[in-house]
């Protein structure tokens, strides 16, 4: 029983993220009992720093370490950690980025022989210079940047979870010089976030400074970490894109928070979660009772999408797929999948739009696919003169690619939209314009694909608010949003970025939805589909690299550090690996 409880807690810790207010509430009972959380955090950070340097075959007494220390508790964590490292012989310089430093942490650091460089002329730090000129302030900033760049390790303890929005002032200047400014890291997708081996290494204390702690956004300059040691529980930035890519390898130190009855702000999908979406076959099952998927996908222009969507749906534990489309696509589907049934009939879910041209494409309506989809989507319309009173009783429907511009103004939650960043920007612009017109409000600033990529959670939530649909926003870490939940799935290797992969996801999603008895589980089912899609890609590519790598618990045995990168794949490989992925999660 002890092992089970421990395993359950580990599962909860490593797949749940809590916003800053929740984390503070979780800390409070422990602080009231006198639990020294700051000292515990500092010990974990110092241990991690020493380990990072040891991995590079560097002894502490031969290293130069720079601490970027803010004025708050995060800076205190860093100062106590830096003091411990200095006591072990490291050459440590603390760069004070604010007007004060945590009093006890600062005293401990000075006693250990650490050096302090103050950057703010208005700082009031005992024994340190202040009141210097603007010219000297600029020189000190350049000195700080130079010292940091020449160090072996930077410990980033500037802001922690307390800041909202982008960095300002001195922290922003340091982040701009030492890190990136409002763009996601562009690095090879190595397994387990392996370090490039370049110095300085960066250890983020709790969260990288400058990222959106609660929404995973990139609002401005930030410092990408080699390793993030996070305290107590994961924060949303550790699991949400693009901030998760700035965290590097994530190490979690368990404070013992009481999280059993706390709903996470973001839940990360894993095998156990995804297994609930797979309906196990019954002895009395027929092809109809196991779930039937109807697909209006592919076109004269893109017939291959019909093959990929039907192939994926058929291999994802359904009893039958029905295909509607032009003759060329029908023939290709039957050649690839003779089990497919051509024509209309009763279904438990629909998949529409994959491989169907948008309205802006020449001859988009030439094969009648768009007309068929528009007529079907009319049954899901809410909140207008075209409202269908039975919309909530309609089967779930996956609206992909070329069908997104046919989405009605308001739909129930069993309508699932699956855009990538570019498609999401177009959809948001269309619906924001309609909302502004209806409310006689000023027009909004147009969204771009980059806007969506830099703040995908806000984009997905806004799309849900505007449409009512369950939203799956594709990415290296895919986000699924409905009224009450945010799910993240990062099971896919980077090899999945290949033509037709979204078609496979659409078919797989429709298949899982067809297996459900209750549309209330739509978001969970869709998130499970994203996870299985990534897992199938990992199987097909023989890769252990993932968009999101599960953290390691400090004090537990670490997993294999170097993993398999794998090899390129095509979308059809992913579809054929779906049965093995399903077997993996249900076993």
For every predicted segment, state its role.
Residues 46-160, 164-205, 380, 384-390, ...:
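Nucleotide and nucleotide-moiety/phosphate-recognizing core
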Residues 121, 128-139, 209-213, 274-279, ...:
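Short gly/ser/thr-rich secondary-structure transition/capping motifs
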Residues 153, 158-265:
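Internal gly/pro-rich beta-alpha loop/helix module
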Residues 146-147, 221, 463:
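Structural alpha-helical scaffold elements that stabilize or flank donor/cofactor-binding regions
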Residues 103, 126-127, 140, 213, ...:
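Short secondary-structure boundary/hinge segments and terminal tails
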Residues 1-98, 225-227, 233-416, 421, ...:
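Small-residue (G/A/S/T)-rich helix-start motifs and N-terminal tracts that mark the onset
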Residues 107-110, 116, 129, 133, ...:
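Compositionally biased, intrinsically disordered low-complexity regions
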